Amino acid sequence: MAILVSLLFLAIALTFFLLKLNEKREKKPNLPPSPPNLPIIGNLHQLGNLPHRSLRSLANELGPLILLHLGHIPTLIVSTAEIAEEILKTHDLIFASRPSTTAARRIFYDCTDVAFSPYGEYWRQVRKICVLELLSIKRVNSYRSIREEEVGLMMERISQSCSTGEAVNLSELLLLLSSGTITRVAFGKKYEGEEERKNKFADLATELTTLMGAFFVGDYFPSFAWVDVLTGMDARLKRNHGELDAFVDHVIDDHLLSRKANGSDGVEQKDLVDVLLHLQKDSSLGVHLNRNNLKAVILDMFSGGTDTTAVTLEWAMAELIKHPDVMEKAQQEVRRVVGKKAKVEEEDLHQLHYLKLIIKETLRLHPVAPLLVPRESTRDVVIRGYHIPAKTRVFINAWAIGRDPKSWENAEEFLPERFVNNSVDFKGQDFQLIPFGAGRRGCPGIAFGISSVEISLANLLYWFNWELPGDLTKEDLDMSEAVGITVHMKFPLQLVAKRHLS
């Protein structure tokens, strides 16, 4: 009898245990697949020097939607157009916020800019200002003369090298071009000396973007943020922010003095700072802009505008050197359309159909920010049957999506002709090509960036024939990528220019 009672008790206990175990399993959320992770650091060691490439390799093993544990931060990686559309369109509102990072908080005044501000009323109002006042088509067109003048200066610098046959550092010249253009558009003027201008603007922009993509321990292990002080990263960030802050303060003070001296109330708006100062007094705005808010938005324009043009042009010229038949076809088009004029002007651009295909193909293979700007979920959501918790960081691998063989035939090849009779564009409606993102947090400065790229590339191809220095061939050109949130070529693009027009 005792044995039967004991067996009955064991049976009841085992049944209870199994029910509890099953209940626990049922309650466990169905998370996306994850690679094995290490204690404490999680999957950080699997990012590598070029995360967009490492993450594509992981996606090839585990699938297009994977969950990583980067230190203490759950991070979703999206690698196909279909899932990107779910994130950026179907559930855009849930994923419309941004994670707060060490660099963004410091550089952009506690994330009060447009790019890194959390989703909310402040962001909506400031983005509205940017879209309607700072980056509208009308405003972009009003800066045509600045773009043409800055491109003309670059052509003159390149022409000086033609007489000696020396190679030019095209990467450096393109950075000077983009920083000079954005400085005049945003601030109304630039320094006269080339070296001073380079040091003050191009170098500051380069360091800013480097820091935005740098590793800060506190971003992944909040309790250990003090380690960034020991490594020197905190001091480096403070130094860059201090220089940027002093520079933008000087720019704003200059504008205020000029307005006071001229008795201007802001009606005559010459540059982006003028527009912002005028809007600061507009009581109809849904948000008050203090001085730090102005500086955050100004730095957004400064950093974003500089990189988009320089990086895209650098990769476009490198691909054309690699594909001389494509370059020749583009040169023939530009020279036929422009004729014997001294330069390409913006009214010529609408006829340069092949050049536009080259730019589109360049952005497919070389998006400026391969992982875009990270997003963050504001509440729990289900994607493809997987539970995604609130406060999950999200990276969209635009680089991998642009090279997905399911979306693109011969995906790794540079073939501008793929876009002939193909309506796919990069403006955020076609998710197989999203170099500027999509949805609410898509880049509002596409028109400004592309207008600068088109006029610059057209003039480079119109004025000059290009080749590698010495006995180098196209096979010798190193297409390696540099490390950063925006991806330049690892080694500066050195080319020999030969004047086409005498």
Swiss-Prot record:
Triggers of expression: By ethylene.
UniProt name for this protein: Cytochrome P450 71A1
Gene Ontology process terms (BP): fruit ripening
Residue spans crossing the bilayer: 7-21
Protein's cellular compartments: Microsome membrane; Endoplasmic reticulum membrane
Family: Belongs to the cytochrome P450 family.
Gene that encodes the chain: CYP71A1
Function as written in the Swiss-Prot or TrEMBL entry: Involved in the metabolism of compounds associated with the development of flavor in the ripening fruit process, possibly by acting as trans-cinnamic acid 4-hydrolase.
Residues annotated as binding heme: 443
Cofactor: heme
Organism, scientific name: Persea americana (Avocado)
EC number(s) recorded for this UniProt protein: 1.14.-.-
Tissue specificity as recorded in UniProt: Mesocarp.
GO MF, one annotated term: monooxygenase activity
GO cellular component assignments: endoplasmic reticulum membrane
Phosphoprotein keyword on record: no
